[in-house]
A protein has these predicted regions:
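A common structural microfeature
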Residues: 4-6, 52, 69
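Active-site region of glycoside hydrolase catalytic domains
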Residues: 1-39, 83, 91-280
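Aromatic- and Gly/Pro-rich amphipathic surface segment
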Residues: 25-60, 65
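Catalytic domains of carbohydrate-active enzymes, especially glycoside hydrolases
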Residues: 54-75, 107, 274, 278
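Glycine-rich, proline-tolerant flexible connector loops at the mouths of alpha/beta enzymes
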Residues: 74-88
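Short, flexible active-site loop motifs that bind/organize anionic cofactors or intermediates
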Residues: 45, 52, 81-84, 126
């Protein structure tokens, strides 16, 4: 690995903090149309590994690994339990955690949305509706105002294609829907949210000093039968939906998905061009 390669660890609030009340905690309690539980054996996150209370111990473990960075997400549902109401005690908690990281020479990398959001936002329609984007932007502004003086690396949204496909195509993530067109709309709205947040935060105090990026995982989809034309068409379509549409949008300002009979969407926003300081 090159000398400048960054080694670190990463978590998501819902996966480690415990006692979250959000779209995922609600989904964990639900059942599918056939009556089967959404989660195998009705497992629920519960207190998880209690990172909320045990973060000082966890940070010591990170330090023992001799890595330099820790990416974590802040839990929107805890920071803003009701629309328009921010919990100062929760904001203070994350502030102490950031200070502890810095004291241990670990660089904090803050993620603003990692799969979860408040139930009140879910009831508004979440990212199914473009008009809800300003609500997310407002949350991001408040968090950025609190921590931008100490946090230099910011991730807007974690893996938007996962949220869109697993939540709205396969139905394996909340809200458990299976609608390919809606999946494309949600992906478009998540990317629109990223672009808006990027530009708003860049105009705030410290905005030009920090780096703001999007977290995108790349999954390669190969044809089942390499000799079969239809399999190639399917794999190419899935690759474009999951990977290329996001990359193209940030390079050209054009978001385009065209899968006959499944999803058809075209959106242009030139503000998206280069609206990321890093991508990964």
């Amino acid at each position: 690995f090159p000398p400048k390669f960054i080694w670190g660890t990463a978590t998501a609030a819902h996966q480690v903090e415990g006692n979250c009340t959000n779209n995922w905690s609600e989904f964990e309690k639900g059942t599918k149309d056939g009556g089967q539980p959404n989660i195998k054996d009705n497992q629920q996150s519960g207190i998880a590994c209690d990172h909320w209370n045990r973060y000082p111990e966890d940070i010591k473990l990170i330090k023992e690994l001799e890595v330099s960075h820790y990416r974590f997400s802040v839990e929107w549902s805890k920071i803003q339990p009701q629309q328009g109401a921010f919990d100062e005690a929760v904001l203070s908690h994350y502030s102490k955690m950031i200070d502890t990281l810095i004291e241990n020479n670990i660089t904090p990398v803050l993620t603003l949305h990692h799969f979860t959001h408040p139930l009140w936002f879910e009831r508004l329609g979440a990212f199914e509706k473009e008009e809800n984007i300003p609500v997310f932007v407002s949350f991001c502004e408040r968090v950025f105002k609190e921590y931008s003086g100490r946090v230099n690396l910011w991730c807007t949204i974690n893996e938007p294609a996962v949220v869109a496909t697993q939540g709205y195509f396969s139905g394996m993530f909340p809200p458990g829907k299976k609608d390919s067109q809606l999946s494309a709309v949600v992906l478009k709205n998540l990317l629109q949210a990223h672009v808006k947040v990027y530009h708003v935060l860049k105009k705030m105090e410290n905005g030009q000093k920090v780096k703001i990026g999007l977290v995108k995982n790349i999954n390669q989809f190969d044809p089942w039968r390499r000799w079969h034309l239809l399999d190639w068409m399917i794999s190419n379509s899935v690759n474009h939906f999951y990977n290329d549409s996001t990359i193209d949008f940030l390079q050209t300002g054009i978001f385009k998905i065209r899968i006959p009979g499944l999803a058809w969407i075209y959106h242009k926003n030139m503000d998206a061009v280069n609206a990321t300081d890093f991508f990964g």
